[in-house]
Amino acid sequence: MSIDALKERIPDFAKDVRLNLSSMASDETLAPQTKYGLFVAAAVATRNPDVIAAMQAVARDNVAPAVIAAAKSAAAIMAMNNVYYRFVHLASNKDYATMPARLRMNVIANPGVDKADFELWSLAVSAINGCGMCIDSHEKVLLAAGVSTAAIQTAVRFAAIIQSVAVSIEAGAADLAMAAE
C-alpha cells in the first residue's frame, strides 16, 4: 500500500489528517534515513496494519532494509520500555524507581544505524505511547548529540500525524461496518 492509497482511505471527516499526511510526505526537514525510519517506527506504534504497510512501502523505496529493521526495533523496545517506565514514573510508591528494571535493551546501545536517528524514533514512539519519562530521557540524549529542537518537534509532529491517520482510518471503517448492518 502506498501513502496515496492510504490518503484515499482517510474519511472526509478527517480532511485535515489527509492534508497533514500529504504535507508530511513531502516535507524534507529531516534527512531521508531519519524521516523514513521515523515513518516506520511510528507506524508500527499505531498497530494499524494498513498504516504499517504504507509506511514500510515508502521506506523500502528510500532506505536500506537495515534502517527499516532498526526502526521496527525502536518501536518494539519502546513498546516495552514505555509501559515499564510510565509505571515507574506514575506509581505513587517511588521505591520502583530504585529497583533494577531487569529488561534487556541492548538495541538502544547498538541499533545498527545512526544513534541519533534511533533516539529520535524512540522519542516519537514514546510520544505516541505517552511515556513522559521516556520522552525526557530521549530528548536529553538528542540535545546532547546536537539534534535541534526543530528536528525533535518535527519528529513528534510526524508521529502525531501518523497516529491520527490510523485513528481516522479505524473510525471510518467502523462507520462502514455500521452502515452495512
From Swiss-Prot:
Q: Which catalysed reactions does the entry list for this protein?
A: N(6)-[(R)-dihydrolipoyl]-L-lysyl-[lipoyl-carrier protein] + a hydroperoxide = N(6)-[(R)-lipoyl]-L-lysyl-[lipoyl-carrier protein] + an alcohol + H2O
Annotated active site residues, numbered on this chain, are 131, 134
Record has Protease as a keyword: no
Q: List the disulfide bonds.
A: 131-134
A Gene Ontology biological process term: response to oxidative stress
**Is Oxidoreductase given among the entry's keywords?**
yes
Q: Which GO terms describe its molecular function?
A: alkyl hydroperoxide reductase activity; disulfide oxidoreductase activity; hydroperoxide reductase activity; peroxiredoxin activity
Quote the InterPro entries the UniProt record gives: AhpD, AhpD-like, AhpD_core, CMD-like
Family recorded in the similarity comment: Belongs to the AhpD family.
Which named protein is this?
Alkyl hydroperoxide reductase AhpD
